[in-house]
Amino acid sequence: VSVVALGRGAQQQVMNQTSELGTNTLDTFPGKDFGDTRAAAIETLVAADAQALAEQPYVDSATPNVSVSVTALYRENAAMAQVTGVGFEHFRVKGLRLASGRFFDQRDVDLHAQVAVIDQKAATALFPGNPSPLGEVVMLGEMPVEIVGVLRPAQNSFGGSTPTFFVPYTAAATRLVGKYHLDSTTLRIKDEVPAEIALKAATSLLTERHGTKDFFVWNSDQIRQAITRTSTTLTLLVSAIAMIALLVGGIGVMNIMLVSVTERTRE
């Protein structure tokens, strides 16, 4: 019973961590699939697509995404960092929470504001011993940004180890990336809407906007389903092992009792 309980507890822990990844989301990428060599040449996925998706009745929130790797520099501390340009709704889409400071808002996006929300890895790498980096200015490549928020530490182990800066996508596009088309969009589906229905509707909308299907949509709920199947299988395996161990232990006890009875009968 204890072994089975441990297995189920581990399964629940994995599912709780998975839920923090924002599994009720749809990601749209240019190209036919991951690894499409022609995806880099497709420039039709734009911020207006994310806005159009955000206005749909099945969507809770949506964000455009552009990313680039740069050297982050603060005084004598430097680190390779991932700069992700996003909309102000990104933090709602992903279910991220603050440890301190604030998220940037629509006004920051409209003004191409050079502000950033950082994760704990960035805070540790660039501000060792500084419990409050708010208001500090970091150089991201050639762009200075002011730190306005620090995210809470992630409770899951699925993230990478690279320090991450979230900045308004408008600032990233004009001052870092030098392009106006997107790497991807991400939308959060309303809780009461089935993911498959939302996927079909989003695909139809973007196909109509682009005039062709030059993108693919990734349903991140597939991750949750795969992890659920795997953890269920592991729980069943642990239960089977526990039953076998119990059976073997019972046979051992029976043998000992039989030997004891035989000896007493002989006496």
Locate the predicted segments by residue.
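Conserved ABC ATPase nucleotide-binding domain "signature" region
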Residues: 113, 222, 248, 262-266
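Intracellular coupling helices
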Residues: 242, 251-267
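Hydrophobic, regular-secondary-structure patches
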Residues: 7-82, 89-92, 107, 124-125, ...
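Peri-transmembrane interface segments
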Residues: 201-202, 208-242
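Helix-terminus/capping and membrane-interface signal
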Residues: 1-23, 233-237, 241-249
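Generic structural signal for small/hydrophobic residues in well-ordered secondary structure
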Residues: 10, 28, 53, 62, ...
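Residue-level detector of beta-strand face positions
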Residues: 71, 135-139, 216
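Mid-to-C-terminal secondary-structure elements
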Residues: 88-104, 108, 113-211
